[in-house]
Every structure is written in structure tokens, then in C-alpha cells.
A protein has these predicted regions:
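Active-site region of chymotrypsin-like
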Residues: 125-131, 190-201, 226-319
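N-terminal activation segment of mature serine protease catalytic domains
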Residues: 63-144, 165, 302-305, 309-320
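Alpha-helical transmembrane segments and their juxtamembrane interface "caps"
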Residues: 1-112
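Conserved active-site neighborhood of the chymotrypsin/trypsin-like protease fold
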Residues: 134-142, 149-226, 309-314
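Sec-exported extracytoplasmic/periplasmic mature domains
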Residues: 16, 35, 52, 216-219, ...
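Short secondary-structure boundary/capping segments
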Residues: 119-120, 181-182, 206, 246-247
Length: 320
């Protein structure tokens, strides 16, 4: 608030220099007050958007439960919120998103036509944000995830790598007790046990086919939540980087998507029009609007191997 008041004071003094020699002191006071209030509001919005990605459950809950702050952020134009998120990510370190250089299919532009259905609207409630402090690497990790079974959240291994206490935050800003119970750094999949999470599991579907129009959901750039369209350009084998060792993995099956994937989308679901999960976002190309996702068949195999785990596992080391 001090910064906002200071900005308003400067603006007010500038106006006063003019109004002191005119009979407009009443108007000057009015507009000075408006500028002061607007500056204070802007500072509060910037702080709220910036601080909600800090992995402190008490702070996350307090910000989400404040009706005034929630209204102010909701009333802020999207272009302003996007700019705040971009600046925040430029100033603060939020980990990395894997980049894939080997193309499976020719690249095309990301679609602009969105897929709308009641099933997708319902599925959005089961998509969560993952926050965590990777102390070894000195950054805050942000990513996405989704409920795949009762009390079980799926995300990427690189999202929680080196994070001892990840925070699972739902669309209402509530945070939940959690434990990482599965890590597969080769396939870049991790499971988080959240026993009290009151969200419906999403159905795991079958692999999508080339040319399919799908929707990917998550919290790009640390939020807010977005559901964006994508086209499956192809499905095939490519080489990716191990989330723990940093070395190249063996060839594995992935989707190549025409999609505007950003940091923070990692771990979010790719869904068909019926709300079925057909993939999990994990990376993007080195340039252009091309993203990559783990296939539904790979996810099903991982769930069969570790979906019932309850014991905590090591999250390994983070990668700068």
C-alpha cells in the first residue's frame, strides 16, 4: 500500500501545481484521490498474482479466501494479468519445461477454435496447480496436475523433482495435505497422494489419433487456469531428457501437438471432447507453437504399476 500511496502522491502533486493557480482545487482533490486509489489497487493486484505461486499453504489459502482480492484480480483485464505473469516469471526463477528438438510430424500453427462441451467444463474442476520449492536449485517450481483416482493426482516428474513438500492447490485456491508416492523420471510421470481431496477423478481414455482436435488444461506461467485447443500432429517415438539425471532417455512414444504450451502447463491433462484424458503435457519444441504429451497408454501402464502406492518416495534432484 505504501508504494501505491507514493505513486498517488506524486500524481497529486503534479496536478496541484496546475490547480493552485486555478479555481479547480475541488476537482484536483477528487482526481488525486482517484489516482491514489487506482495505484493502491494496482499494487494489490500485482502482489496477489505474484504471491499466489509461493508454495506456502497458509498464504495461498489466505489469498484465495479474500473476497476483496479475488474480486480485484477477477476484474483485472486478461492482458494486464498476462503481462504481470510474464514479468513475474522473467524476474523470478520458476524452473524449466523440457524442450524436444526431434519432430515427429510437420509443424502447424496452434488452432484457435476451442472445443466446448459440458464434459470439458466439468473436467476443469479436477485440474489442480502444483507448487513447490526446489531448494537445491534455488527456484519455485510451478506446474499442473489432475485427479486420476480418488485422492491421487497425476503430474510430471520434473514438476516435483527436488521438491520435498509440494503444494496441491485446487481451482478454489484451497491447499491439501499431500505425499509424492510415485516417480518415473524416464516417462516423466509422478503421482501425488492427496487423501482428502474432494475432486472427481477424470476418466483415462485411449490414445488420440493424428488430426484430432483436443483440449489441454492447466496453469500456464503459474496461473490463472486456462483451457486451450490443440491439434494432434502425430504420435510416434522420440528421445527426451531424464528429469533426474539430465541424460537422454531411450526412445519413447509421445504426441506432438500444435499447441501453445507454456511453462506451468507441465503435468496438465490433454482431453477429448468427452472429457476423457488422452495424454499428459510434458514439454514443448525449441521454437514455434508445438507441444509434447505423454500418451494415455503410457499413463495407464504407470497407474497400473504405482497407482496404489501410499508410501512416500524420493523426488530426486531438480534440474536448472
Amino acid at each position: 500500500l505504501t508504494i501505491g500511496q507514493w505513486l498517488g502522491l506524486i500524481a497529486g502533486r503534479t496536478i496541484r501545481k496546475v490547480t493552485d493557480i486555478t479555481p479547480l482545487k475541488g476537482i484536483e482533490r477528487f482526481f488525486g484521490g482517484v489516482l491514489n486509489l487506482a495505484a493502491c489497487a494496482l499494487v494489490m493486484v500485482v502482489l496477489t498474482i505474484s504471491m499466489r505461486t509461493v508454495p506456502i499453504p497458509q498464504l495461498n489459502t489466505a489469498l484465495s479466501e479474500s473476497k476483496t482480492l479475488s474480486w480485484m484480480v477477477a476484474s483485472t483485464p486478461e492482458v494486464v494479468k498476462d503481462r504481470i505473469n510474464t514479468v513475474r516469471n522473467d524476474v523470478l526463477a520458476f524452473g524449466t519445461i523440457p524442450e524436444v528438438s526431434q519432430l515427429i510430424a510437420p509443424e502447424t500453427s496452434a488452432p484457435t477454435q476451442t472445443v466446448e462441451s459440458a464434459a470439458l467444463d466439468q473436467a476443469a474442476a479436477s485440474v489442480v496447480e502444483i507448487l513447490g520449492a526446489a531448494e537445491q536449485c534455488g527456484y519455485t517450481s510451478t506446474g499442473s496436475g489432475f485427479v486420476a483416482d480418488n485422492g491421487l493426482v497425476v503430474t510430471n516428474a520434473h514438476v516435483v523433482a527436488g521438491v520435498t513438500s509440494p503444494v496441491v492447490q485446487d481451482s478454489r485456491g484451497r491447499t491439501w495435505p499431500r505425499t509424492v508416492v510415485y516417480m518415473d523420471t524416464e516417462q516423466d510421470l509422478a503421482f501425488i497422494s492427496v487423501p482428502k481431496l474432494p475432486l472427481e477423478p477424470l476418466n483415462i481414455g485411449t490414445n488420440a489419433t493424428a488430426g484430432s482436435l483436443v483440449t489441454f488444461m492447466g496453469y500456464p506461467k503459474g496461473g490463472p487456469f486456462k483451457a486451450l485447443p490443440a491439434t494432434v500432429q502425430g504420435i510416434g517415438n522420440t528421445q527426451t531428457i531424464d528429469a533426474d539425471t539430465g541424460r537422454a532417455n531411450a526412445m519413447r512414444q509421445v504426441y506432438q501437438l500444435a499447441a501453445d504450451v507454456q511453462h506451468g502447463n507441465s503435468g496438465g491433462p490433454v482431453l477429448d471432447e468427452n472429457g476423457n484424458v488422452v495424454g499428459v503435457i510434458f514439454g514443448r519444441a525449441t521454437s514455434g507453437q508445438t507441444g509434447y504429451a505423454i500418451t494415455a497408454s503410457t499413463l495407464k501402464q504407470a497407474l497400473a504399476e504405482g497407482g496404489d502406492n501410499t508410501a512416500a518416495v524420493s523426488t530426486g534432484t531438480c534440474r536448472k
